[in-house]
Amino acid sequence: MQERLIVAGEEGRRTGRGEMQVGRRSWSRALALAGLLLLLAACRQQAPEPEQPVVEPPRPGPIPQVVEPEPEPRPEEPPGPPELPPLFRDIERRTFQFFWDTTNEVNGLTPDRFPSRPFASIASVGFSLTAYPIGIENGWVSRTQAVDRTLTTLRFLANAKMGPQARGRSGHKGFFYHFLDMQTGERYDSWVELSSVDTGLLLMGVLFAQSYYTGDDPREVEIRELADRIYRRVEWPWLQRRPPLISMGWYPERGFIAHDWKGYNEAMLVYILALGSPTHPVGPEAWEVWTQTYERDWGVFQGQEYLSFGPHFGHQYTHVWIDFRGIRDEYMAMRGIDYFENSRRATYAQRAYAIENPMKWDDYGENVWGLTASDGPQRTTQQFKGEQREFRHYSARGAGLSDAFDDGTIAPTAAVGSIAFAPEIVIPATQEL
């Protein structure tokens, strides 16, 4: 849980820190030069002065008492990351094992859910590719094992059949269908869309693998080459049906999805990947117009002023791979925060919502909180405390200024996945849950 996984944005983070380091070095150099000048002045040979008559010095009087000024208090060092309880080590290991144990060893596809394994999710594959290096770093698998699994996955993705046909294909124009058959790797069913955001989550894992496996071994070289091929073939402008925004996806039976990615949500990574494409990029106006759709999402919720999106995963997913501390676009510069701080505020707002508990669910409180996309009990309407309440099976549950839904289902991933943003409230919540 303590790893910080970074792909895109690393250079910006380094630049920010680099500027700080230059400042410190400049200040240190100035102090050193000043000290050197004082030493030179003290050691410089003085010109002889004319002789003066010897005068008997007066008898010394009482020595005045020197009162040393009290030193100014030094500013406190910022606290380091808290020591994580053993529970988190167990969660980290179990999370890794889920991706390692459930993935199809033949093609590298990871199921959308477990223990039922009806289909693979390409987003899950992206998270699997990210998890394997964590297994290496912790000694849970060898580098050779992880390289083998990663190569299997990337070879399948690079060679998967693409085309406009409704059946027998894994994707089209470089994009992948959201759900694939676990065995064949082809589109699972006619209701499955060609997904821009799930392709984005897949690509984040692909590019993370490319960044991690930097060895000269031919197999690691192949990983980097395959990752490059997979990223380069995605034709981002093809999904700009209403430029410059990017559509959510496409169906071979009925064409492009009528909705574009707008408002603050997990699609941040879609625009980042599309802007950075070396072969089929979108123009910079795509980001500008996308951030212009933020306005309905900025405001105060549960005492926190931030860019709101109800389901908490929207404040987490892009941050898995990009460290946004100190990185601000024009919109966030205007607001005076960065996206990392925004996610921190969103985390506190989720907790405050559970403490207030406006729907009077049982057990909600300061350490029982977190609404995000997850499975639920069932799809039904039932009486609860004298009211008719809607309950759902799978749903993007959330608390915020928009996209809010609460049927009393707390998903532990909402809290645990925010460990980087607010460990001081996430640790007790995780222990309670």
What role is predicted for each listed range?
Residues 40-42:
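C-terminal motif of bacterial Sec signal peptides marking the signal peptidase cleavage site
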Residues 1-2, 15-17, 49-50, 61-62:
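Compositionally biased, low-complexity intrinsically disordered regions
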Residues 44-46:
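Bacterial signal peptide processing site
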Residues 3-12, 55:
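Ser/Thr/Pro/Gly-rich low-complexity, intrinsically disordered segments
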Residues 11-32:
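Bacterial N-terminal signal peptides that target proteins for export
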Residues 49-81:
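Post-signal peptide N-terminal segment of mature Sec-exported envelope proteins
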Residues 73-433:
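Ser/Thr/Asn(+Pro)-rich, low-complexity disordered segments
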